[in-house]
Amino acid sequence: MAMRFLNIGYGNIVSAHRIIAIVSPESAPIKRTVQEAREHNALLDATYGRKTRAVIVMDDGHVVLSPIQPETIAHRLNNKEDLSEEGWVLHIYEK
């Protein structure tokens, strides 16, 4: 079984199989979601002070801010060959 990780910018990675949604931060409902996550200490800011271009919602309720466009992240997620070539696939073998 392989555990896939996804580069979301500036060397930050998230577990690919735990992503529920990758959305643009511009709409009011997403802004409210980000604010609620901040209030509940469930917000992870991976922008390094740059503009937030994507909001990633994880299956455990965490919200991750990324400086990369949602389309770029989705392309990386769908392109399995790029993930393995860049070293973002971790193979875990269970006994």
Swiss-Prot record:
Which InterPro entries has this protein been placed in? RemA-like
Per the database entry, which stretches of residues form a coiled coil?
none
In the record, the note on similarity to other proteins reads:
Belongs to the RemA family.
A Pfam match is RemA-like
Organism of origin: Bacillus cereus (strain ATCC 14579 / DSM 31 / CCUG 7414 / JCM 2152 / NBRC 15305 / NCIMB 9373 / NCTC 2599 / NRRL B-3711)
Its protein name is Putative regulatory protein BC_3870
